[in-house]
Design a protein with these regions (language model features):
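Phosphate-end processing signature that detects enzymes handling 5′-triphosphorylated RNA
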Residues: 2-178
């Protein structure tokens, strides 16, 4: 695998994303296919995200029942640089997905409280951590997520759960097809 540090910049801000979930036991064949003739975009790193929602989980419900015109709010960092936390809003429209990301002054997730967005109050609802690998294959960006752990809520007393799944995601600009 070649290693490439420069980021892939899409021609526009919208992209299509296709997500596949598989068991760890079956994931090796997919990783073999991905790594063959691909370029490694970044070193493997640990992603940590805190997701926000309303008290009645309206964002989650929209993501389950609506295919477009929805959004996610999260704070994210990379374990290798924990002092950098980003606020991200990921919107899904008929044209594709669009993500905004802005650096914050937070030093850890415990400092982040509730937030207002578009006149609505949102609360931290779940925390997830996973190891991510980033590849470029045939002009498509592919992410490969393993070691997934998660907990509901943000209280440190809440139990973490381990997932035996691997998530593979293809990220394509408008002109590409899977």
């Amino acid at each position: 695998i070649l290693y490439r540090r420069d980021q892939v910049i899409l021609k526009n801000n919208f992209r299509k994303e296709y997500k596949f979930v598989t068991d760890i036991e079956n994931s090796g064949k997919y990783l073999d296919w991905i790594t063959k003739n691909s370029v490694l975009l970044f070193p493997k790193r640990t992603v940590q995200s805190m997701y926000y929602d309303t008290l009645d989980f309206s964002l989650y419900k929209n993501s389950v029942f609506d295919d477009t015109d929805r959004f996610k709010i999260r704070f994210r960092n990379y374990k290798e640089t924990p002092e950098k936390i980003f606020k991200e809003i990921k919107k899904n429209s008929r044209d594709g997905k669009f993500k905004t990301s802005e650096s914050t002054n937070y030093k850890n997730f415990d400092e982040i409280g509730n937030l207002y967005f578009q006149g609505v109050q949102y609360y931290p609802k779940s925390f997830v951590s996973y190891t991510r690998q980033y590849f470029l294959k045939n002009n498509s960006r592919i992410t490969y997520d393993t070691n997934i752990i998660y907990r509901t809520g943000i209280k440190k007393s809440n139990k973490f759960y381990n997932s035996n799944k691997v998530i593979i995601e293809f990220k394509l600009d408008d002109s590409q097809k899977l």
